[in-house]
Amino acid sequence: MSRRGTTEEKTAKSDPIYRNRLVNMLVNRILKHGKKSLAYQIIYRAVKKIQQKTETNPLSVLRQAIRGVTPDIAVKARRVGGSTHQVPIEIGSTQGKALAIRWLLWASRKRPGRNMAFKLSSELLDAAKGSGDAIRKKEETHRMAEANRAFAHFR
């Protein structure tokens, strides 16, 4: 038995302007090469574009988009005997949000277009409406989990 104590889970900090943890999680995932100020710029421009397009609270659109993309279940590769099975596992809320943010950024980077702020705002609006590549990725993951339900007992 380990003598080392358990560590407390870190709480996500909130961003300086909106005081929102989701925005901060998004900033930390979009971050490249340590340029956090550029990441903040991209996010804030995307939020401003959402505000201009919808004329509603952009944070509610962001929450709705992330809620729509968050998966309930995913598959994990598990080696049993000599073969590898895709085992469906339930996902917690924090891990689900992290996956949703990762998929939203992946989908927005994949989009053709001018700059990242424009692409991210478009993807967030699509996800809030229930369409877009990030939503498709979630549905594909759910389909994979449903197809491999027979291996659920390998958890």
From Swiss-Prot:
Chief location: plastid
Highest taxon in the source lineage: Eukaryota
GO molecular function list: rRNA binding; structural constituent of ribosome
Listed InterPro entries: Ribosomal_uS7 (IPR000235), Ribosomal_uS7_bac/org-type (IPR005717), Ribosomal_uS7_CS (IPR020606), Ribosomal_uS7_dom (IPR023798), Ribosomal_uS7_dom_sf (IPR036823)
GO biological process, one term: translation
Any one of the GO CC terms: chloroplast
Pfam families referenced in this protein's UniProt entry, alphabetically: Ribosomal_S7
Location of the protein in the cell: Plastid, Chloroplast
Keywords: Chloroplast, Plastid, Ribonucleoprotein, Ribosomal protein, RNA-binding, rRNA-binding
Subunit details: Part of the 30S ribosomal subunit.
Family of this protein: Belongs to the universal ribosomal protein uS7 family.
Function text: One of the primary rRNA binding proteins, it binds directly to 16S rRNA where it nucleates assembly of the head domain of the 30S subunit.
Name recorded for this polypeptide: Small ribosomal subunit protein uS7c
Lineage, top ranks: Eukaryota, Viridiplantae, Streptophyta, Embryophyta, Tracheophyta
